[in-house]
């Protein structure tokens, strides 16, 4: 399946694209020419952190976030597959690690 992903960046400009359910959101964003923050690309740091505002993702490949953080909506875009249409606020590392 393919889902609609909407990224809300700090500029407030929402960026929308379609993402297959077997492609990481970060990877698909790059394919679309969208520049998002990242570092390890393995789900073991917080550089790519965002917050899911609507919809669902599968980020079981990641290890950095604990269950409480995931429950609060935190997401690592480098290891997140969309499992529905999803809205994500990006560039949230400072808020996550504060």
Curated annotation (Swiss-Prot):
For this record, the Gene Ontology CC terms, alphabetical, are:
chloroplast stroma
Question: Recorded GO terms, molecular function?
Answer: 2 iron, 2 sulfur cluster binding; electron transfer activity; metal ion binding
- Principal place of residence: plastid
Residues forming the 2Fe-2S ferredoxin-type domain are: 3-94
Q: Does the keyword Iron apply?
A: yes
- Does this UniProt record's set of keywords contain Metal-binding? yes
- Per its database record, what is this protein's job? Ferredoxins are iron-sulfur proteins that transfer electrons in a wide variety of metabolic reactions.
Q: What is this protein called?
A: Ferredoxin-B
């Amino acid at each position: 399946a393919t889902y609609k992903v909407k990224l809300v960046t700090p500029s407030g400009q929402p960026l929308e694209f379609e993402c297959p359910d077997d492609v990481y959101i970060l990877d698909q964003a790059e394919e679309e020419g969208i520049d998002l923050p990242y570092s390890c690309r393995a789900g073991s740091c917080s550089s790519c952190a965002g917050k899911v505002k609507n919809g669902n993702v599968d980020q079981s490949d990641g290890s950095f976030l604990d269950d409480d953080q995931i429950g609060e909506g935190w997401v690592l875009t480098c290891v997140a597959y969309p499992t529905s249409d999803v809205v994500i606020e990006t560039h949230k590392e400072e808020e996550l690690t504060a």
